[in-house]
Swiss-Prot record:
Organism: Schizosaccharomyces pombe (strain 972 / ATCC 24843) (Fission yeast)
Membrane-protein topology: Single-pass type II membrane protein
Family named by the database record: Belongs to the glycosyltransferase 34 family.
GO cellular component, as recorded: endoplasmic reticulum membrane; Golgi apparatus; Golgi membrane
Annotated protein name in UniProt: Uncharacterized alpha-1,2-galactosyltransferase C637.06
Species lineage: Eukaryota, Fungi, Dikarya, Ascomycota, Taphrinomycotina
Parts of the chain on the Lumenal side: 63-347
């Protein structure tokens, strides 16, 4: 016989199955949820670990394979040492150490950015005792580098007594690609820095390409670090600098050698002014305390660690200062500043 009460009880059981009654917990579901959460947590940690490992391996691979593949560089670094000493004095152990530190610094920078590294030694050549012709030979070395690397466009001369403080900066990003924004063409303008008091001359065309990039210090043109571009203009300048007649007549009158020569040509030749561009000295030729005597702490000239100056030039360290002590000081500053990068191998 049909019983409505039993039917209601059966229907109630059917509706509640397999869900728990209100106010009760499902122990089985709780255990399964905990297991799933633990599984997903372990899986996520494992995936994160694999991702970090792959990232580090990729960085290492890029640094040591793709980024170091040989390529035809557009830049040549010209660096001159003096293996045999010279006519002025005998080379001491401290001078050897200075040369070793400076050479290693430049070589690492060239390797980092894929630049050609053109090293020349002045050697023990016969010279007159009253001459210091190594400076005049800059023109020869630049022309020799141009012949050796016929496809390169820019040639960076950098003195022995310099130290690159921020090697992560390429010359392209630092200077070459920004010339339109950072270079001054006419330093005779009243608003520009003009320590030699040059005057305007006619027929100068500042719309021509820049072929010579340099800075000025308290005494005039600074040639411890400068850039020249391969061009007919540069070939003409090199010929002027090494002309035997000019050298024979003027080398005793110009105590600063090629610096005085270029200043003389700049003062009197419109074609030379048309191809030159001046950048702030500290852009790639900062001075240490002691250089530019009488200037105190003029921010125009002197190295500023906080602002990350690219290179320090120990100008004049051979006169009353210690070149080795100074280059070791700046080497230590650079190492401390970049120490954290050693934690990540591909930086």
């Amino acid at each position: 016989m049909w019983n409505p009460k039993k039917k209601s009880e059966a229907l109630a059981k059917f509706k509640s199955f397999p869900y728990p009654k209100p106010g009760t917990s499902n122990v089985l579901d709780s255990k399964e949820g905990d297991t799933r959460r633990k599984y997903f947590t372990k899986t996520h940690l494992h995936r994160l670990f694999v991702f970090v490992v792959l990232l580090l391996c990729s960085g290492y691979f890029l640094k040591h394979t793709l980024l170091t593949r040989p390529k035809e560089s557009n830049v040549v670094m010209i660096f001159v040492n003096n293996i045999g000493g010279g006519v002025l004095d005998v080379k001491s152990p401290r001078q050897w150490e200075l040369e070793k530190i400076s050479t290693e610094n430049k070589k690492k920078y060239a390797e980092r950015h894929g630049y050609h590294f053109f090293v020349k030694s002045t050697g023990l050549k016969r010279r007159y005792a009253h001459e210091w012709r190594e400076s005049w030979e800059k023109a020869d070395y630049i022309m020799e580098a141009m012949k050796k690397y016929p496809h390169a466009e820019w040639f960076w001369w950098v003195d022995l007594t310099t130290f690159i403080m921020e090697p992560q900066y390429s010359l392209e990003k630092l200077i070459i690609n920004r010339l339109d924004h950072i270079a001054t063409r006419n330093i005779t303008d009243s608003m520009e820095f003009n320590p030699k008091n040059f005057h305007e001359i006619p027929f100068v065309d500042y719309s021509e390409d820049i072929n010579f990039i340099l800075g000025q210090d308290c005494n005039g043109f600074s040639l411890g670090s400068f850039l020249v571009r391969r061009s007919d203009w540069t070939s003409r300048l090199m010929d002027f600098l090494w002309d035997p007649v000019v050298y024979g007549q003027k080398h005793m009158d110009w105590p600063h050698d090629e610096q005085n020569a270029i200043e003389y040509f700049y003062e009197n030749n419109a074609w030379l002014r048309s191809g030159m561009g001046f950048v702030p000295l500290r852009l790639f030729n900062s001075y240490p305390p002691g250089a530019c005597a009488g200037e105190g702490e003029n921010p125009r000239f002197f190295y500023n660690q906080k602002e990350g100056d690219f290179l320090v030039n120990l100008a004049g360290c051979n006169y009353g200062r210690d070149c080795l002590d100074e280059i070791n000081h700046y080497k230590g500053l650079a190492q401390r500043k970049r120490g954290w990068r050693k934690l990540v191998p591909f930086l």
